[in-house]
Amino acid sequence: MSIEIRKLSHIYNEGTTFASVALDAIDLTIQEYCMTAIIGETGSGKSTLVQHLNALLLPSKGEIQINDRIIKADEKPKQLKALRKKVGLVFQFPEYQLFEETILKDVSFGPKNFGASEEEAEQRAKEVLKVVGLDESYYEKSPFECSGGEKRRVAIAGILAMD
């Protein structure tokens, strides 16, 4: 899946005296199968940019093309559910994404939320936990009992399980 960002601008509180430009005419291409990191100073717009990649935020101006899908300011949130299945995000502190009582439940949450059966979600969770190096001894463990690195792997597995 390739991502093309064209002239993307985002203005918080647009049309008010509190308007603040977070992104101003950004152009960016992310090629298919390319892992990309967004880095920069505090307040530089990293989080705002990343939230546009799966339409958590919509552009004030410009557009984002993900494969054949073009996202503009006038999108309806219900039309974006399929897109959110395809674009997964892992934030700087992915362990903050963890919330279920066991690792297996946490990694299964995404697939279930997007319509997979309990069995399908659990099978997918087990597959991706293996990929990130967490064997069955982790399934019933609380994510909060894990080391920082293990928490990150659980969070990454949760994103991968949605594929």
Stretches with model-predicted labels:
Residues E119-S137:
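Conserved ABC ATPase "signature" region
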Residues N54:
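Helix-to-loop junction immediately C-terminal to a conserved catalytic motif
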Residues I39-E41:
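The feature captures the beta-strand-to-loop junction immediately N-terminal to the Walker
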Residues S2, I11-A25, E75-Q79:
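A short, flexible loop at the N-terminus of ABC-type nucleotide-binding domains that lies
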Residues G62-A73, L83:
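Conserved ABC transporter NBD signature motif
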Residues S142-C146, E150:
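Conserved ABC ATPase signature
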Residues I156:
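Hydrophobic anchor residue at the start of the ABC signature
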